[in-house]
């Protein structure tokens, strides 16, 4: 195109050198302008086609990763839900048998340390089997009884067991090493478990997601389980999500709550950042509300190669090929897909795959040059 314009320039120059009538000169100028305009239009069409082609390529890359991450997330959560429901059934059966043999109710175990330790012994095998087989970062059971009702704050203190993996990243061992986060030190000694450095004897139900909902039949409203939003694990630097399942006896009595814990290390390990020619793609599981991706309430996979902060929500701007996500730290592009997660609140959850906008822009310009 540039060569043609140069040729037209030479023709105009020669026309000036010769005595060509004004009318022919005007026609020549007009043809030159038309040709130049057509050249510019063609150039813009080429650039636009390349740009749209790039957007479509990015959309395809994001969509492929989103489909993969969503399928994995759905499968993982369904698997842990199944194990949690099974654990609840096994624990309730153990408690039913224990109470029947002793002709007692669970409330009779208040202030009876030995009886509560025996209950923990009874439920330990099922809990240990669950954490060894499905390998969440933790498994827990809160029982609606306390070792001492006479101390201050006893109304929010509850007995139970809480086992955690000592090393979430070491999933290759046949038998994972576990530590005791909540429960009697007698259990730790008998099972040769190390006490967590933030160990406590009992649970604080005020900071245990879902407990006050699940043990209250009116509040529970028939919920068989739900997943919590991200919460800080008391006394640690870790963020976690809990599967919350009520423990219900044959008579319909509520014995407490159990489930699994998935911590931030679990998500980093299982949802790694994926490299692409447009930058690192990050997987996020989070609620969406009013065009806001509520990252602070969800969990984030590995953020290697990005500056994504899990403490800041992202505003969503829906575009033709992909979405734009904004925060005070910067911008991302990505796609999201709704996923069915029962929650204590009626949140709409999505799996999102994002990559830094500046990284893909740099990649596009680099490939053009």
Predicted regions, residues:
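Juxtamembrane extracytoplasmic/periplasmic/luminal helical "stalk" adjacent to the first N-terminal
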Residues: 20-118, 135
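Extracellular/periplasmic juxtamembrane segments that couple receptor/chemosensory ectodomains to their
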Residues: 238-241, 248-251, 256-267, 302-368
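N-terminal membrane-entry
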Residues: 26-30, 364-369
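Solvent-exposed, extracytoplasmic
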Residues: 122-126, 257-299
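GAF sensory/regulatory domain recognition
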Residues: 143-195, 287-290
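Non-catalytic regulatory/interaction regions at protein termini and inter-domain linkers
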Residues: 1-23
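Short regulatory alpha-helical segment in sensory/regulatory domains of signaling proteins that mediates
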Residues: 92, 124-134, 219, 234-235, ...
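Extracytoplasmic/periplasmic ligand-binding sensor regions of membrane-associated signaling proteins
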Residues: 180-259
